[in-house]
UniProtKB/Swiss-Prot annotation:
The lineage of its organism: Bacteria, Bacillati, Bacillota, Bacilli, Bacillales. SUPFAM superfamilies: Arginase/deacetylase. This is Agmatinase. The gene is speB. One of its GO terms (molecular function) is metal ion binding. GO terms for biological process: putrescine biosynthetic process from arginine, via agmatine; spermidine biosynthetic process. Gene3D superfamilies: Ureohydrolase domain.
Amino acid sequence: MRFDEAYSGKVFIKSHPSFEESEVVIYGMPMDWTVSYRPGSRFGPARIREVSIGLEEYSPYLDRELEEVKYFDAGDIPLPFGNAQRSLDMIEEYVSKLLDAGKFPLGLGGEHLVSWPIFKAMAKKYPDLAIIHMDAHTDLRESYEGEPLSHSTPIRKVCDLIGPENVYSFGIRSGMKEEFEWAKEVGMNLYKFDVLEPLKEVLPKLEGRPVYVTIDIDVLDPAHAPGTGTLEAGGITSKELLDSIVAIANSNINVVGADLVEVAPVYDHSDQTPVAASKFVREMLLGWVK
């Protein structure tokens, strides 16, 4: 990668030219094969990169600049269109290689099922892993219309993998009654409607533990993020999500990886959603990479 490409829109702004010298690797997962309503999130990673050239490199939230963190944008994993299982296998293999290389993986989706193979790779690396999950939806189904590979299932899958007591979901305002009942029955940490205040209460409990953070853009109210596949009224503001990212940055937890998913720019011709997403990525880079 040439230095001038760092401002081209082909990569996330200010991307470092060297994989070897970088602490963080940004990678895209352009998959929306299993969505239940509106496809289009496969175009999210590219558009987040394109609009990132409009970002300031300085964060007034964290008093840091992007040049202080070395991150490499590796582009998108070349996922086979329509083949969900092969796509998930490729994501798990890629993230495992990043972890073996000592990199902080920062993934861009794509539908939320792409987080499932990442969870598996992270759990192998960190046996005491905890998950912070911000979303409008529970994502606790075992299957959707009989299909276990669905974007409505990744949090149920990771609960089964690492134990529901190690999964913390915030901002939840939609799901089947059975999903909410299951979460309560098994002792999962599910916080409805809000993110920031319950997150502040949880963070001290996670100090010293490796934590993976997954953010579904639809945790935001559609007024703040219309470009997503499954809109859900009654969400949080972009400011609350920014404040939550900063709260994590100012805590003593050890964030070991993250993803931001379900940006579907085809439904947002003003680019409001990818512009917000690119700002969230900036704050993750500056706040979570210690």
